[in-house]
Amino acid sequence: MEKFVTHTGVGVPLRVSNVDTDQIIPARYLKSVKRTGFADGLFSNWRSDENFILNQEPFKEGSVLFAGPDFGTGSSREHAVWALAEYGFKAVFSSRFADIFRGNSGKAGLLTGLMEQEDIELIWKQLESGETETTVDLEARTVTVGGNSYTFEIDDYTRWRLMEGLDDIGLTLRNEGDIEAFESTRPGFKPRVVAS
C-alpha cells in the first residue's frame, strides 16, 4: 500500500446522498477477488448518462470525491473501495459514511474523511465554478480548494496506517522478527505455518 501524506488533484462534486455500494459498483461486476478490473464498473449505471459528473471535463480525471451524506451504505463490498481506488480516487469526503465502508477504505489505502455538510456544499460550489484543484493534507487533516482550507476528521489509527502505507499484511510484516522468534521456540509437535 502506498503512503498517503498529501495529494493534489481534481476535486469532484458528487451531489448525491445515500450512495450505496451497489450504486458505487453494481453486483454484476463482482466476479473477481483481485483488486483490479473494477474501474469500468464504478458508478456504471450513472456513467451511461452523458451528463453524469464523471463524464464531464475536468471531473473525469478526478481523484478527490466530495459526496453527499451516507456514502458507502449497503452491503460490505470491498469491490466498491477497489473500484474507487482503481479509477484514481485517493480520497472521499462526506458528512456521513457507512462504518463498514469506511473501515474497508482505510485498510485498502483510500482516505475517507468526515466533513461538515456545510463545508461540503461550499466545496461543491467552488468545484462547479471551476476551482477544481484540490489538495488533501492528511498530516494537517485539511482539504484546500481554491485557496480555502477546510478541516476533516479521521481517526488517529487509520490516519497513522495511511501515512505509513500499512495494510493488514504490512502491519503483520512489521512484526516478522518477533513472529519468527516465537515460531523457532515452538515444540515440533505443535502445528505451524509452512511457507509454500
Swiss-Prot record:
Its EC number is 4.2.1.33. It is an enzyme of class 4 (lyase). It comes from Corynebacterium aurimucosum (strain ATCC 700975 / DSM 44827 / CIP 107346 / CN-1) (Corynebacterium nigricans). The gene is leuD. The keyword RNA-binding does not apply. GO terms for biological process: L-leucine biosynthetic process. One of its GO terms (molecular function) is 3-isopropylmalate dehydratase activity. This is 3-isopropylmalate dehydratase small subunit. Heterodimer of LeuC and LeuD. CDD domains: IPMI_Swivel. PANTHER family: 3-ISOPROPYLMALATE DEHYDRATASE SMALL SUBUNIT (PTHR43345:SF5), 3-ISOPROPYLMALATE DEHYDRATASE SMALL SUBUNIT 2-RELATED-RELATED (PTHR43345). It catalyses: (2R,3S)-3-isopropylmalate = (2S)-2-isopropylmalate. Keywords: Amino-acid biosynthesis, Branched-chain amino acid biosynthesis, Leucine biosynthesis, Lyase. Disulfide bonds: none annotated.
